[in-house]
Amino acid sequence: MVNALLPLVCLVAAAAPPRYAVEVNRPGPDGMNVLFDSVHHPETTDFAINNGPSHVLLLDGTDALVIRSCVHRHGCSTPGNPDVITLVKRTAKGPIDLSNLQGQFEKNSLDKIIVRPQGADEQCGVQDPRITVDRKTGRYLMAYTAFGDGTAHPNICNATACGPTWQQCSHCCKSVKTKVVMTKTPEVASSWVRVNRTGDDGFDAKSTATLVRDTPPHFQWTGTGTVRSWQSEDLFHWTAAEVAIAGRPGSFDPGYCEAGAPPVQLADGNYFGTYDTIISGAKRHGWAAGWVVLNGSNPREVLQRGSEPLVEPTRPWELQTPPQWNWTQAVQEGGVPMIGATNGLMPLGGDVFLAWACASDSVVEAFVVRVTKW
């Protein structure tokens, strides 16, 4: 008999990744979740078109939105009526009143403009801002889409020459790319400085959401059609692109995907993010949004992706239902049902967020999103 201690070997199954459930509700009376509606509530905005909102918690503890805005309804995103970016603050303090969101924000007035087009490659607009803050340095970073054509001759691409509609100006408005501005005083328009960034091919494609971390690397998600992730040690040079979010044939998002909001951290350390998409199916179509949970240790890893849309167009302001909503930008663009530009996530506490988006490219919307870990 061998009197020896044999090693005890235990086989332990690898832990399954956490799973999350996401619940979405529309705040406001009867789900009327619209803000900055220039037609039905002109007292809330000086701009005919208000869309593409992004959220930031200012360093003084005030919630703020940056909004893509056009002064006139017709010919938005042309040299004569380009998109600008405004910043409006929440005036109320304490817990947010979900039944009266509009009443807690400043008017989106002309004096709230913080970024205007500069140069031929922005002559048609500065669009779809996504803002975040580096709390270690006190520096705000805002990525936006520059829309124009840097090669166009100024004699044929100006407010007088190219006409009042986008169709007449299409030859002047055909290039898009991400640019970034930074400041330590976000309400002061003159303080925003365009920064020079470099990177591997495609780092400055249209639509960029940035995750600034206390310790590098930092990350960004960029692109339309397919979203890729990038990393940086200093927020100025971006490398090592990887596919992050691509279309899923057979799912609600079979093809087009576009970067959404800067990710927000969940209680367990992972991140929650959004993306825009074009849904398709027998009973649904149009612009909508999806969601992902990213690994807190490696935000480039998608731990879970929603099997159903986060939000999809079902209400009159998203379907352009006449006569109340047939004035919107989306009608001019062909009348496609639309919830787009889910560019902001506002933490409410306890893994509950306000997701900011726009309806029909014309008004701001908000949705309450509750994330639950299994």
What are these model-derived regions, one by one?
Residues 1-15:
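Cleavable N-terminal signal peptides of Sec/SRP-targeted secreted and luminal proteins
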Residues 16-124, 133-255, 265-335, 348-374:
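Beta-rich carbohydrate-recognition and catalytic domains
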Residues 258:
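ATP/pyrophosphate-binding catalytic subdomain of soluble kinases
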